[in-house]
Structure formats: C-alpha cells, structure tokens
Amino acid sequence: MGIDFLFILKALIIAIVEGLTEFVPVSSTGHMILVGDLIHFNTQSGGFPEMYEVVIQLGAILAVVVLYWRKISSSVVEFLSYIFSFIGLKTSGDKRKYEKRLAESETGFRFGINVIIGTIPAAILGLLFHDEIKEYLFSTKTVAIGFIVGGILLIVIENNFRKRAKRSKIVKDIDKMTYGQSLLVGCFQCLSLWPGMSRSASTIMGGWISGLSTTVATEFTFFLAIPAMVGASGLDLFKFDYSQMNATNWISLILGFIVAFIVSLVVIDKFINYLKKKPMRVFAIYRVFAGIVLAILIFTKVIS
C-alpha cells in the first residue's frame, strides 16, 4: 500500500492547530475535534486519529520543557536534594550540614509539591472516568457548549479578578504560591476534561480566583501540563493497537510531533508577552463566537 500524502497533509493541519491552541485559553482538543471533522481526518478506523492527537500533544509539551528547562531542571534537583537532606537530617549526626541544604533547596521542593498537588484532582478524575469521558464528551456538540460556557466564565472571572487586584495582594512570583492555591488551580483543571473548556483557561481561572497574577497562573498552567498530559497520553498510548500502523501513519506521527513542537515554541513565547500587556477578553469573545457558529453548523447539519 502506497503513502497517502493527502492524509499526511490533513495530519499536519491538525498538528498546526494543536500547536496554535494548546497553551492559549481556547481548547486545543475542541479545535482538533472540530477541524478534524471538517477535513474528515477523524474518519479513519482503528483509533489512529485519537492516538495521533495524543502524540502531537506530547510535542507541544516538549516545547514547555525546552523553554522552561532551567526552572524545571533546577526544581527537580532541589526537590530531590530536599528529600535526601531531610533523610540525612533524621539519620545523621551532622545536622548543621543538612539544615543548610534543606534551606537552600526549599524553594524547589515547594514548587515540586505545588505541581504534584495541582496534578492530583484531574489525575484522579481522569483515571476514574477515562472511558466515559472519551465516549460521552468527545463530540462537536459538547465542544460547542464548552466553547460558550468557557468564554463566558473567562469574561466574568477575569473582570472580578481585575477589580479584586486593585484592592488586594496578588501573588506575582510562582515560587510564592501556597499549597492551597495549587490545590484550587488543580480542582479547576478538572474542567479541562470536558473538550471545549480548555485546560489553560480552566487553570488560569483557578489561578485568578486563588489570587495569582495572570502571568503566574499561566506559567503554572504550563508546568501542570507536563505531568497531566504525559499521564493522560501514556494511558492512551498504552491502550493503542500498533499492529494496524502503516507507513502513512508513522510518517504522519513523526512529522506531526515535530510541527506541533515548533509551533508551540513560538506560541508560548508570544502568548506570555501578550498577557503582560493585554487582557484575555479577546480569547473569551472568540470562544463564544466560535461556539455559536459551531452550534449553527451542527443544527444545520453542515457538520455532525
């Protein structure tokens, strides 16, 4: 069987969509479902389109790792150093040495704990209801509703946040986050299990409500994406039957991963710079408009 170049082109379009939307509050999964339906990418049997979307999401996550490598690597080192120093403090006679190491590595340890806490709620919910979420929530209808609901929530919560920020203290340093704030953000991340809601929108809204600045909430969203998406992707990749893969599938997979990675690199940098100057309202308005248009297309049976 020859290589299907049209299918590869469709796959690359989906990868570009993923890279453009993964880290902005518009729902990458919702857009991939919508665009995939429009270009008939989702019609291939055997579950390849779903597995492909999982792989290109990992490409997007790699972009976060590359851009924030210094913070990630130093935090991992400090996290492990804190654990070993704590053990040493309890078992060794040289307490002064280990107390010093504990103090030096406390920032990285707290950051690591915050990421773990923020990951737990969605991880539990995703594991418990993985099959039900895939079966009942992955459709254009639920995406349309998610677009609109998420857009309205973004407008309401951001307006409330900006009023509150004028009269109360806002956390502007990611290392100053409390465990309670990370838990609240993690609970909001559960909303992202609904395609169309957007993981970044959900966690940023949680950050606003918990008292984080927009930049801190967004950066914490990036870090939460690593364990959340690697875990979810690992489960899907483990269940996939690779015996059905052909040359077209493998080429699509490799190129899609690379394209999603490159596009995400650009988008993350631009998005952070945008947020330092302007509000999220434009994304919220786009979501509501896109949701209404999608609902009309579904109602008129232009798409299913």
From Swiss-Prot:
InterPro entries referenced in this protein's UniProt entry, alphabetically: UppP
Q: What protein is this chain from?
A: Undecaprenyl-diphosphatase
Which domain of life, per UniProt?
Bacteria
Which family does the record claim for this protein? Belongs to the UppP family.
Q: How does it sit in the membrane?
A: Multi-pass membrane protein
Q: Name one GO biological process term.
A: cell wall organization
Which taxonomic lineage is given here? Bacteria, Bacillati, Bacillota, Clostridia, Eubacteriales
Entry's transmembrane regions: 5-25, 47-67, 72-92, 111-131, 137-157, 209-231, 248-268, 283-303
Keyword Cell cycle part of the UniProt annotation = no
Gene Ontology terms, MF aspect: undecaprenyl-diphosphatase activity
Is Transmembrane helix one of the keywords UniProt gives this record?
Answer: yes
Q: What is its EC number?
A: 3.6.1.27
